[in-house]
């Protein structure tokens, strides 16, 4: 089949079958070994052999979402970092679960390893910044590190590719399944994202109205009461509607925003600056991290 595909791609030209496949593999391995060891000399100095990540690498975030850090077919060695945050108030531990796969949810991907980062300073949800770094070396060995940027505490895991490595057939199957279920996965992820957006907004408002550096000292008593009522009702609605549709979450978010946003605007106009003493861009950046 591969030979026929090559023939079709090159306008009917016959593939050269004069090379022994075993010899080609051995020769390629020898050349790659020479390049990696630096002992190839002049014969390999102009040769560039590129290895790639066979499947996307990422971690699980709230809702069982596969948050991707290193996409499939990324040339290795490579390194990628991303900042995440906590999902609950006063959360002192986060679990880092490393997966490979092309699906939107981790339940449909393959778990490679996991570890916990403990000792995070207790703080409101969304406040801590946890930097997760994925690094794949030239041998395909994956190192994952999680560091609390507030305390400097970190943990890491090394995942080698010699145990339980997927065959090419298994990799191709996972890619095919991702393509087959792409539309279904998209809808599920959109529903989870809509729920997370509502939760994040509500908790952000709760934190702001109780934070003296943000809204606590700037709100009138009736304004604070309106926001407290709206956020309380939204959280109760979330508890009662765990499996609501995307449109339901979006509609509920609009309802809460309709109560809170005019109050925030009024505070902004009275104080002559952005609520919380910072720019809206800074606040958006602080609140924009995926939750663990």
From Swiss-Prot:
Q: Name one GO cellular component term.
A: endoplasmic reticulum lumen
What does the record give under GO molecular function?
ATP binding; ATP-dependent protein folding chaperone
- Glycosylation (residues): 241
The source's superkingdom equals Eukaryota
Question: Which InterPro entries would you find in this protein's record?
Answer: ATPase_NBD, HSP70_C_sf, HSP70_peptide-bd_sf, Hsp_70_fam
Give the UniProt subcellular location, in the record's own words: Endoplasmic reticulum lumen
Motif Prevents secretion from ER extends across 289-292
UniProt xrefs under Pfam families: HSP70
Q: Which UniProt keywords apply?
A: ATP-binding, Endoplasmic reticulum, Glycoprotein, Nucleotide-binding
For the region Disordered, give the residue spans. Answer: 268-292
Acidic residues: compositionally biased ranges: 280-292
- Coiled-coil features, chain-numbered ranges: none
Role of this protein:
Probably plays a role in facilitating the assembly of multimeric protein complexes inside the ER.
Write out the similarity annotation: Belongs to the heat shock protein 70 family.
Q: What is this protein called?
A: Luminal-binding protein 2
């Amino acid at each position: 089949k591969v030979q026929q595909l090559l023939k079709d791609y090159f306008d009917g030209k016959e593939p050269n079958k004069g090379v022994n496949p075993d010899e080609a593999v051995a020769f390629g391995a020898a050349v790659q070994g020479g390049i990696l060891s630096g002992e190839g000399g002049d014969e390999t100095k102009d040769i560039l052999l590129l290895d790639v990540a066979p499947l996307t690498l990422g971690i699980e975030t709230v809702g069982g979402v596969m948050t991707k850090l290193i996409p499939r077919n990324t040339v290795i060695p490579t390194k990628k970092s991303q900042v995440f945050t906590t999902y609950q108030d006063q959360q002192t531990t986060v679990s880092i679960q490393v997966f490979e796969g092309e699906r939107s949810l981790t339940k449909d991907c393959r778990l490679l390893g996991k570890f916990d980062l403990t000792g995070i300073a207790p703080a409101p949800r969304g406040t801590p910044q946890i930097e997760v770094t994925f690094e794949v070396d030239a041998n395909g060995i994956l190192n994952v590190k999680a560091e609390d940027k507030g305390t400097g505490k970190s943990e890491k895991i090394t995942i080698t590719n010699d145990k339980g490595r997927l065959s090419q057939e298994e990799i191709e199957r996972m890619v095919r399944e991702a393509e087959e279920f792409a539309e279904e996965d998209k809808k599920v992820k959109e529903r989870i994202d809509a729920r997370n957006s509502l939760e994040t907004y509500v908790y952000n408002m709760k934190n702001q109205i109780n934070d003296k550096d943000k809204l606590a000292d700037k709100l009138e008593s009736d304004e604070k009461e309106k926001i407290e009522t709206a956020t309380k009702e939204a959280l109760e609605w979330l508890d009662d509607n765990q499996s609501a549709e995307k449109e339901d979450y979006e509609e509920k978010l609009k309802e809460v925003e309709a109560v809170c946003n005019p109050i925030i605007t009024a505070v902004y106009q009275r104080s002559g600056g952005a609520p919380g003493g910072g720019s809206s861009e800074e606040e958006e950046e602080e609140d924009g991290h995926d939750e663990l």
